[in-house]
């Protein structure tokens, strides 16, 4: 039976609960324990799949096709444990399930209420896989006191009550604001946050206090006294130069030991932090630097491309270089020349996205990379834009475009080199879709196999002829244009096993130009960089010597 750690937050949002959870998971693994991390989000959306990246940041896709919170990306990157659909839930999903059961008559005519029906559904979700791991870490989204989070707080209170004593603990993240005028940290917001938590029946066992300044021993004792926790359980969380310092920093502050003490695990296994020391060394001691331009649509919010930014960092670690990322708004190229914005970059990456806005700029970025021999990685829409660019400017299909843009405009304007994907094979079943289907959960989602063409660049990079990668798209390069594009020199180097869906394209006469329909960034880790990103940065490093 798993031990449960519930992670909550107070005072303000965006304190870093996800990173703290991921770092703690990594530290417990370093001591020989198995872990699984979960995220419970109070918002009423069923999942983040239809939410704007400006609202929510990126959508992290699991192998089994769940569209989840970006924190699950942190969980995977720090622990190496592949997330599942059962590791993420929202109020919307919980309420939807409860209402479906009510319609089926599962509740036998009873009045449906938040307590017990909604809270029971949350508790059932938390308990999934109870016997699979040593520790289950459950992060509650939002902050204590938010009205939409109350059912989740009540559910974890009940869950802890139902379990044997010592089976569950609570870890609460707060902020210690610093007043420059008086030159002191203020503990009152933390005290009030804990008081709010206690008022709903939850007493934190560990306090993680975010601070920009060292926490004096006197203040630590004060927090412990008024929040009713041991002094050793008041853990400082300071701002770091890189998130990959978090496991070592939290270990230095005693977080993992405080957790083991709270569970009365003694003697505690000693941690092996060799991997994280190596990661930290690679981040802090690069032997050079490369500049990568990300030409995207949501560049005002870096969290919209969180996994891509991290995967580039991982590629830098693999090559002992610092990757300097600059965000370029693709719409700028609608009215301005590409060259002044992209000159001096050692590589160009065009990420995924939806809608026509900014796509002409992405096509121009792909053209610039092709014509100027700049390493190019196109992901999802970035691959589609590279194919459209090749069709227009090399294969002489002047009206080449995407059905997505025609659907958005309500009229036919392009020859659809990229079309709406209406059916595909998933496992042993055929999946069908129509243009008018609901948006949520109707894309080609999750891990799919692909066959690589021997002798191609991607086959050399992967060192295999068969791969599986995660997808999130409803538009696809039309296979009927393959012959025309290959006659122009483009190579379709990766295909779905049935040979119907192009997964990877490349220009063989280019130093490094690859487009992939999937999202390789979702499987990259600091201690195991994705091979595409590692080789992309290798090519950028090589190009940096030529620029």
From Swiss-Prot:
Q: What's its top-level EC category?
A: ligase
Give the binding site residues for L-glutamine: 353, 381-384, 404, 474
Active-site positions, per UniProt?
Answer: 380, 519, 521
Give the residues the record marks as binding UTP. Answer: 13, 186-191, 222
- This protein's record includes keyword Lyase: no
> What SUPFAM superfamilies does this protein map onto?
Class I glutamine amidotransferase-like, P-loop containing nucleoside triphosphate hydrolases
User: Boundaries of each Glutamine amidotransferase type-1 domain copy?
Assistant: 291-546
Q: Name one GO biological process term.
A: 'de novo' CTP biosynthetic process
Spell out the molecular function terms from Gene Ontology. ATP binding; CTP synthase activity; glutaminase activity; identical protein binding; metal ion binding
Q: Which UniProt keywords apply?
A: ATP-binding, Glutamine amidotransferase, Ligase, Magnesium, Metal-binding, Nucleotide-binding, Pyrimidine biosynthesis
Q: How is its activity regulated?
A: Allosterically activated by GTP, when glutamine is the substrate; GTP has no effect on the reaction when ammonia is the substrate. The allosteric effector GTP functions by stabilizing the protein conformation that binds the tetrahedral intermediate(s) formed during glutamine hydrolysis. Inhibited by the product CTP, via allosteric rather than competitive inhibition.
* InterPro entries assigned: Class_I_gatase-like, CTP_synthase, CTP_synthase_N, GATASE, GATase1_CTP_Synthase, P-loop_NTPase
Chain positions recorded as ATP binding sites: 14-19, 71
**Quick one: which pathway?**
Pyrimidine metabolism; CTP biosynthesis via de novo pathway; CTP from UDP: step 2/2
Chain positions covered by the region annotation Amidoligase domain: 1-265
Q: Which residues bind CTP?
A: 13, 146-148, 186-191, 222
Q: Which family does it belong to?
A: Belongs to the CTP synthase family.
The free-text function statement in the UniProt record for this protein reads:
Catalyzes the ATP-dependent amination of UTP to CTP with either L-glutamine or ammonia as the source of nitrogen. Regulates intracellular CTP levels through interactions with the four ribonucleotide triphosphates.
Share any extra remarks.
Answer: CTPSs have evolved a hybrid strategy for distinguishing between UTP and CTP. The overlapping regions of the product feedback inhibitory and substrate sites recognize a common feature in both compounds, the triphosphate moiety. To differentiate isosteric substrate and product pyrimidine rings, an additional pocket far from the expected kinase/ligase catalytic site, specifically recognizes the cytosine and ribose portions of the product inhibitor.
HAMAP family xref list: PyrG (MF_01227)
Name assigned to this protein: CTP synthase
């Amino acid at each position: 039976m798993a031990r449960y750690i519930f992670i909550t937050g107070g005072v303000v949002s965006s304190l870093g609960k996800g990173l703290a959870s991921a770092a703690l998971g990594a530290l417990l693994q370093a001591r020989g324990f198995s872990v699984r991390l979960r995220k419970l989000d109070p918002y009423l959306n069923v999942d983040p799949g239809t939410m704007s990246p400006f609202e929510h940041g990126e959508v992290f896709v699991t192998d089994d096709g769940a569209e989840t919170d970006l924190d699950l990306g942190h969980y995977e990157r720090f622990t190496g444990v592949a997330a599942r659909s059962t590791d993420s839930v929202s109020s919307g999903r919980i309420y939807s399930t409860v209402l479906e059961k009510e319609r089926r008559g599962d509740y036998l005519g009873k009045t449906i209420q938040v307590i017990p029906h909604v809270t029971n559904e949350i508790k059932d979700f938390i308990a999934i896989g109870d016997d699979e791991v040593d520790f289950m870490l459950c992060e509650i989204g939002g902050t204590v006191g938010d009205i939409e989070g109350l059912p989740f707080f009540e559910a974890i209170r009940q869950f802890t009550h139902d379990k044997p004593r010592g089976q569950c603990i609570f870890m609460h993240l707060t902020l210690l604001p610093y007043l420059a005028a008086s030159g002191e940290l203020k503990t009152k917001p933390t005290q009030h946050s804990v008081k709010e938590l206690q008022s709903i029946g939850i007493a934190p066992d560990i306090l993680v206090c975010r601070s920009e300044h060292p926490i004096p021993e006197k203040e630590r004792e004060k927090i412990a006294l008024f929040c009713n926790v041991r002094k050793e359980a008041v853990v400082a969380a300071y701002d770091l130069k890189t998130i990959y310092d978090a496991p070592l920093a939290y270990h230095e502050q005693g977080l993992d030991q405080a957790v083991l003490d709270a569970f009365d695990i003694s003697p505690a296994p000693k941690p092996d932090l060799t991997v994280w020391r190596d990661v930290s060394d690679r981040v802090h001691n690069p032997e050079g630097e490369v500049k990568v331009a990300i030409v995207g649509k949501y560049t005002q919010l870096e969290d919209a491309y969180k996994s891509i930014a991290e995967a580039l960092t991982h590629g830098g670690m693999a090559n002992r270089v610092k990757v300097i990322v600059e965000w370029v708004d693709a719409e700028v190229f609608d009215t301005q020349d590409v060259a002044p914005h992209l000159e001096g970059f050692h590589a160009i990456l065009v990420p995924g996205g939806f809608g026509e806005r900014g796509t002409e700029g992405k096509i121009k970025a792909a053209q610039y990379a092709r014509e100027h021999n700049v390493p190019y990685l196109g992901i999802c829409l970035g691959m589609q834009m590279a194919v459209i660019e090749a069709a227009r400017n090399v294969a002489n299909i002047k009206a080449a475009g995407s059905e997505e843009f025609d659907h958005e405009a309500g009229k036919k304007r392009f020859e659809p080199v990229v079309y709406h994907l209406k059916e595909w094979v998933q496992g042993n079943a055929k999946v069908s879709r129509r243009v008018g289907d609901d948006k949520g959960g109707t894309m080609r989602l999750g891990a799919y196999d692909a066959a690589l063409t021997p002798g191609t660049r991607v086959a050399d990079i992967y060192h295999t002829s068969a791969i599986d990668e995660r997808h999130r798209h409803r538009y696809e390069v039309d296979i009927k244009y393959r012959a025309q594009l290959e006659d122009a020199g483009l190579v379709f180097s990766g295909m779905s096993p049935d040979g119907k869906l192009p997964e990877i394209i490349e220009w063989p006469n280019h130093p490094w130009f690859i487009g992939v329909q999937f999202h390789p960034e979702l499987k990259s880790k600091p201690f195991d960089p994705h091979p595409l990103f590692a080789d992309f940065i290798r090519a950028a490093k090589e190009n940096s010597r030529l620029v």
